[in-house]
């Protein structure tokens, strides 16, 4: 698996993310060619140009930057990644990670837009199943809470019919029985 970035830095300041430690925060979004070059350089280094039995079998968009803030470039990259004359990765060989933006793009929520226009696996960075704690870990939760995220994830599933991955880093303060019960409750509502 290769992990790709969509920007240089990130201004979301998620507490558990190494990118949040960069002093300048978001420097800029990456261009399509810069996103693509990450996998091209790795494939070239590994001599991984076979059409079957690839060394890099899957790719995750989980590096620096929030996918939802570079959608147009990400969409073009994913088209290249999926195209059988280019990188030739199927939709289930690519996972796009997001903190769960519920803002709008072209009259759709970002998550719904990703489902309609990108059509890959989606991974949601949750990291706490309790809003008050997620507010501290991931300040974007104050704007887009878990409660606002769940209906958007259901829409994503209806569009793609792909299960949604829940990302949850085990931290000292998010492993209680209360957290586990809240996480189970969320996962019962979201096809994951």
Task: List each model region and its residues.
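Conserved AdoMet/S-adenosylmethionine-binding subsite of the radical SAM
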Residues: 44-192
């Amino acid at each position: 698996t290769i992990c790709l970035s969509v920007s240089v830095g990130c201004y979301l300041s998620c507490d558990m993310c190494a990118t949040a430690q960069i002093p300048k925060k978001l420097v800029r979004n990456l261009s399509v060619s810069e996103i693509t070059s990450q996998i091209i350089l790795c494939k070239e280094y590994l001599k991984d140009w076979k059409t079957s039995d690839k060394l890099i079998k899957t790719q995750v968009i989980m590096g620096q930057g929030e996918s939802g803030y570079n959608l147009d470039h990400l969409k073009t990259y994913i088209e290249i990644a999926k195209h059988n004359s280019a990188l030739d990765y199927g939709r289930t060989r690519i996972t796009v990670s997001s903190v769960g933006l519920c803002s709008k793009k072209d009259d759709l929520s970002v998550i719904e837009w990703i489902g309609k226009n990108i059509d890959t696996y989606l991974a949601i960075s949750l990291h706490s199943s309790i809003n008050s704690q997620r507010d501290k870990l991931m300040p974007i939760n104050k704007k887009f809470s878990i409660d606002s995220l769940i209906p958007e994830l259901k829409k994503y599933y209806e569009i793609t019919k792909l299960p949604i991955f829940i990302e949850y880093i085990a931290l000292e303060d998010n492993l209680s029985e209360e957290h586990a019960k809240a996480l189970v409750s969320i996962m019962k509502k979201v096809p994951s």
